[in-house]
Curated annotation (Swiss-Prot):
Residues 1-18 form the signal peptide. This is Probable insulin-like peptide alpha-type 3. It is found in: Secreted. GO terms for cellular component: extracellular region. Belongs to the insulin family. It comes from Caenorhabditis elegans. Disulfide bonds join C28-C58, C40-C71, C46-C72.
Amino acid sequence: MFVLLIILSIILAQVTDAHSELHVRRVCGTAIIKNIMRLCPGVPACENGEVPSPTEYCSMGYSDSQVKYLCCPTSQ
């Protein structure tokens, strides 16, 4: 039971990190493209033309789930 609790806490920590301000600041600037490519592997990212601009991405503080919704055609 203890091992299951540890695994669950690790998973939740990773999910929480994807939405934290520190994570968003870390992927601001030129790291945005790398982050989008990491979130949308194997598909042309943002092919619907809704790629967030670096200024918008950083000022709005998009979480990874919001970027997936905007940019990954298979996640919708």
